[in-house]
Amino acid sequence: MLLALFQTKADQPNIIYILADDLGWGDLGCYGQKTLKTPNLDRLAKEGMRFTRHYAGSTVCAPSRCVLMTGLHTGHARIRGNGRSQLQSNDITFAKLLQQHGYQTGCFGKWGIGSPPPLNDPYIHGFKEFYGYINMYHAHNYYPEFLIHNGNKVKLRNELFNNWREERTGLQYEGSGVAKITKDYAPKLIADRLISYIHKAASNKSKPFFVYYALNIPHANNEAGREKRIGNDGMRVPDWGSYANLDIPDQEKGFARMIDYIDKDVGRILSVLNELNIEDNTIVMFSSDNGPHQEGGHKMEFFNSNGPLRGMKRDLYEGGLRVPFLVRWPGKVPAKKVSNQISGFQDIF
C-alpha cells in the first residue's frame, strides 16, 4: 500500500498510523458498539473508509507489530511470539523506507517489538524521533517511573511498590510493575508529545512526515490485575470521566475511560491537521494490534468488545485476529465507504 505513494515527490502525503492495544472489533460505535461513545473515530469512518474484514498480524502484541512494520506475514516474520526474538539491524521496515524517501519519522507510545537491547531500539528501524516505551512489559504500566526519549530515560513522578523492582529482574522487564504513587499518566504525556511533534514536523514544508502512534491502551496492566494493594485493578486511569457514576465495576469504568481517551486523542489529531491546513494531504489510519483482552479485572463480554465474532486476544478465531481498520484521506479515499475486502497488516507496507 505505502509503496504506491512514491510516484513523485509532489505526491507524498503525510501519514499518521494509529494503533490501539487490545481494542476489539466491537469497541467502536462505527462497528456496532452501543454503550461506549467514540464520536471522533466514528467521524473518521464517516469521512473515509471502514474495513470490515481487516486482520491483525497475530493474536498478540509483538508478532502483530512485527508484521505491521515489516510487511511480512507471520510465517515469514522474525517475531512469532511475545518472547526474546527481535528484528535485526538490516531488516527493512516501512519506517526505514519512508525515511529513505525523505520522510520525517516519529514513533510515539509502545514499540514492543522484541527484546533485549540494543536491537529493539526504534531508531535502528527507521524512527528518528521516539518517545514512549521500548519494552512491552514496561508498557503494561500506565504509571511508570520513566519513559524513553530517543534512547534516554526521562524520569517521571511515579513510584513503584518496592517488591516489583525486586521481582521483575532482567532488561526486558525493566520499569514494569505496579505504581503506588501515580502522578504522571503516561498515555497523556505521550499524546501531548505526539501533538507537539506534528506541529514541528508540519513546519518543515520541504519534507512530509510519518507518525506511528502506538498506544498502550486499552491493554491491561496485567501485573496490577493481581495486586491486592490497589484492589486488583489493572485498568487504572486518572479519572473515570462520564463513566464515574455508573454502577459498574471499577475496572470496567477504567476500560470505558481508556476508549474515551483514545477517541479524544484522535479528535485532537484531526483538529491539529485542520488547524495546520494539512488534512487534505494527510492519510490517517486507525487499527488495533489484535482482538480484545480479558485481563486486569476487565471482562471482554461486559461491553461486547468482540461484537459478533468468536474468540478474543490469543485465540486463532475471528475475534482474536479481526480488528477495526479506518482510513481517511480527503479527496483520495471516498467518504462513507465500507469495504468488505479482506486485508491485513502485511498489506500496509
Q: What spans do the regions from the language model cover?
A:
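Bacterial N-terminal signal peptides
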Residues: 1-4
